[in-house]
């Protein structure tokens, strides 16, 4: 592997600009070599003066890079020392409180089931648990800084060696000895001391002297690329996806056959549509995860996941494939229920019962930690006014806004099973008397409109909570206003629908109000998508016209296509209104909703790429590479300042005005590969070292 590729694969993305610009140095050397005057057409003194002038410029640039690296390393080292002192104080305070309250000095003597502990003991137990997590994140930051130290030294050594080879001189090696090998970032060994001290503290104070357990907690898997999934996971992904494709083909033929003989298919579609959207969402989220990893967007940090244990894209594909198989089998069973002894209404209940059990299964199987994380996140979303709102909280609430059809179909299913289903019949497709008007699929009884507003309500109260915490009207109250437009849109849609059914004279008034608020809502959300969520249309975008100053994904066309796609799908309701308002055929609205619901999930899938990219660039601007975890809570002023930094509209702008030369802004970013596979006491990140010039 060439060192340039090795460097790009192992850097910490959030610190990318603080590394040696190896590619820019290579371009300088090759450009100087190509533009050098030939000895055949000019005298030797002219050639020497040319290279002397170039070397002066080259070494001046090296000095600037070295100063930049020294400064950043010193700042991060000082930050690490302060953080270590803080963690030690927090640990000592927790141990002192335990000692005073129980008269014991070791954690081993205090170990007993959590439900047997008093309130004070529960608090201390949580503090110790938080400290373990905080030390593991701090240890990760130390490894990243050590990796930064080693990569930069290797980069200087290789580029100066290349300099000497191209210019046929030894001045590069001399410059390295005089400047690089005595530079603070290389000579300072405090980082190694901090790593050793952290290992000792975790081993002796938090793991009762069990070094193997301590190192298992501290070390992380290689992060230079996506973590390879186990072979059996890869096998299951292929197996489940293959079966799912075959079953879908079977479903198509079965559906064509059944639609020719049975016209009561719409209750079935409404009940199974939500399950399909959930499977589509999980599959597209797997593609999101793969794309983020490939581009170097650190979604693990953004969502504050455990870097040692989180779902990869293959795991998400596996879950989507497994649920897809259950969905297909259940739907096929409904199609062939007339020849079965099991009543047709059992199959949807069995499908969604299995899905719910998969999520809430209390045993530590089937990705227990990830499911538990999701359940906690859902709880935080639905109790938003009572918690501080983090990125993962409002990200999930935004996903629910695109999955509102699932909630509406769930409400329909509950209503259908409660009021419309004939439990004493078992033939046909979810029997419903076609002579009786449908009750559950209409707005007339009010519940449907309320359910449709739930996702927007969750984001609305999250925005109000963030305003309460920060006291900043912009962007939080303005964002709340965006979600409030959904309430008006749904209200007038419901009023129009009910008045149209009853042939009221004021139906047209509610229709125009519905259209008006649809236009307001679509324009509002579109502008927010492009400007605030994606950070596009930046006036300082430079060569990235209509985009932003800094982009992560390699092709600008991705951004332009995403903008067009977002505009089209944000205004797709115009087609729905046009058709439903001019057509009186039954189930036209159902057909359009069934077509547009998967498209909305796809729109959110595209939105996810650029929303997390924008958040990642904010982390890069703050050089934030690990989670900030502390037992001691932030005071109100610190919390407000942190929220302001996170919500800064131009948080990713104006970061490249002082560039000394240009380099490719779209370079593929990947997280650093850490030394998790080294021996127990060897925590140093090994940098690939080769003297083969073909690999440099």
From Swiss-Prot:
It is a multi-pass membrane protein. It holds the Pfam family SPX. Residues 1-228, 297-309, 384-388, 472, 535-553, 627-696 are cytoplasmic. The chain crosses the membrane at residues 229-259, 265-296, 310-337, 344-365, 389-422, 430-471, 473-503, 507-534, 554-585, 588-626. Residues 439-643 form the EXS domain. InterPro entries: EXS_C, SPX_dom. The modification Phosphothreonine is found at residue 690. Residues 158-165 are annotated as: Important for inositol polyphosphate binding. It is found in: Cell membrane. Residues 672-696 are annotated as: Disordered. Residues 260-264, 338-343, 423-429, 504-506, 586-587 are extracellular. Homodimer. Inorganic ion transporter that mediates phosphate ion export across plasma membrane. Plays a major role in phosphate homeostasis, preventing intracellular phosphate accumulation and possible calcium phosphate precipitation, ultimately preserving calcium signaling. Binds inositol hexakisphosphate (Ins6P) and similar inositol polyphosphates, such as 5-diphospho-inositol pentakisphosphate (5-InsP7), which are important intracellular signaling molecules involved in regulation of phosphate flux. The SPX domain plays a role in the regulation of phosphate flux. Inositol hexakisphosphate (Ins6P) is bound between two SPX domains of the homodimer. The SPX domain has high affinity for inositol polyphosphates and its affinity for inorganic phosphate is two to three orders of magnitude lower. This is Solute carrier family 53 member 1. It comes from Mus terricolor (Earth-colored mouse). The lineage of its organism: Eukaryota, Metazoa, Chordata, Craniata, Vertebrata.
